[in-house]
Amino acid sequence: MDTFENLTLQKERYVSSAFIDSSLKMGIAQSVLMVQDNLTECFNQMGCDGIVYREKFNAFWVFTKTRVRFLRRPYWRESITARTFPIDNASFKAHINTEILDAQNKPLLLANQQACVLDLEKHRPLKISSLSYPKENFPSPVFDEPFENFHVDFGEENFQFEQIIRSQMIDMSHHMNNIEYIKLALNIFSDDFLQANEVDFLEVHYQGESKEGQVLRVYAKNIDGRFFIFIKEQERLVFEMTIAFK
């Protein structure tokens, strides 16, 4: 039986210029990037990251949902601490919490991610409980807001723009990178809007894969000040996001 002595990755980080937007604060998409990066390093620390799973199980991780609550976005050159840890092992899916804290140990950002594991050849889900992954003694969650189902209809009247997927938008999976979807969704807003409105929370669902050369169509709907953004490849929904501002 595999043993996991340390389930929490705590990393001292620094908000470098690579992580800020035009407000000189950590950007919205860049915040999710830091959460995702810390998760990857946490999995590496536990010996269950994508490299290990590919070699041992011919499998790979897929991150299906992310929800982030923004309390305060840190500024450029601010020192922060990022803590990431798994909170469960629910057979075919797992949830992982991240909290980002300021120098006074006050929370800046709280996040929960949902992930599953797929067989590399047939892309069928595998039981995480049967793999090398923690099964007990999980740390207490710091963020337990439930994921939502987006029951929102949209049509061509909600179309915003389209984007061809280029080579620099794909990653090691040879599919479009998760963060690139978020950046694309955020492009429905002007820079002036994002400067004037501070983000409260967002939730993203990665619904499918898309590849270089495909054309993505972006749709958006504002319902009582809350935005729902959908990205389609032809008739196939590949990404959806909701975002609210304070």
Regions found by a protein language model. Give the residues of each.
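Hot-dog-fold acyl-thioester-processing enzymes
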Residues: 2-63, 110-112, 119-198
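HotDog/MaoC-like acyl-thioester-processing domains
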Residues: 2-11, 67-71, 75-151, 210-212, ...
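Short coil-to-beta-strand transition motifs
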Residues: 78, 155-159, 215
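Structured core of small recognition/catalytic domains
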Residues: 175-246
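Small beta-barrel nucleic-acid-binding modules, principally OB-folds
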Residues: 58-73, 197-209
